[in-house]
Amino acid sequence: MFHFSRNSIDVFGLSIHYYGILIALGVLLGVLLAARRQKRLNLPPETGLDLALICLPVAVVCARAYYVIFEWSAYKDDLLSIFNLRRGGLSIYGGVLGGALAVFVYSRIKKRPFLSLADLAAPSLALGQAVGRWGNFFNQEAYGAAVTQPSRMHFPLAVFIDADQTWHYATFFYESAWCFLIVALLLLFERRRFFRKRGDVFFWYLILYGLERAAVEGLRTDSLYWGPVRVSQALSLLAVLAVCAVFARRRGRFGKWGLLCPLPALAALILVPTRLTGCLSPLALALYALTLLFAFLQYLPASSEQ
């Protein structure tokens, strides 16, 4: 009747992969969280479910398309494999871009503020990522470089990969833990009324996730590349830059220095390559933290606004 394996469970002969179960669980928890928050954002009670039904299919298609585009060599000889999602192959940034487009279209059709809808979606998205990342654990993917020090060969710092019988840095766990922290911070700051304007929850999601992804992506061995550039790192820094530009525009001429916010993170990518060490150095962590501090200072209102 039931048979459990490393990455799936067989129910009456039907194989159900844990990856899909965890993605579905992340979606469900995200929808429930949105349903609890929509009233606070002055949105109709059906908004959360509407966004889930409309955005999720678009996000999945775009997440898969994004991944396939950058891994075309693996699919060009077997096009039908593009539709096989049981072994993973979904890009979070592709899903975010597709979901954002769907939210924008929905906002135009329903005549609701796009940024309010984005604020509603952001914590739910982070929660879905936090849960869904555990699908990478069962699929044994999205891990980092091999661990050479015996003292680091234990979970959650590292994970044992069956394919090469080697311990690797558990980058999926790092991202999952950080995304849970993002959810907690966004909800805490929202409750404490730290966010002042429409779109702030979404913008801070982009900053917090963007910096984490830029840092952790450097540890991974399966990054998507465009030439020599890790695509996710480039998009992460562009997202941080875009948000800092929004903060700068809000503050007028006093905020233009905010455009320099991403520079420490960029310096971390260039000057402290994780490929050489396999892990983040204290200098790299300090530079990413400095970018976060700059963004926070840029977000604070100018003295004339206080």
Language-model regions: role of each:
Residues 1-306:
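A feature for loop-to-transmembrane-helix boundaries and adjacent hydrophobic helices
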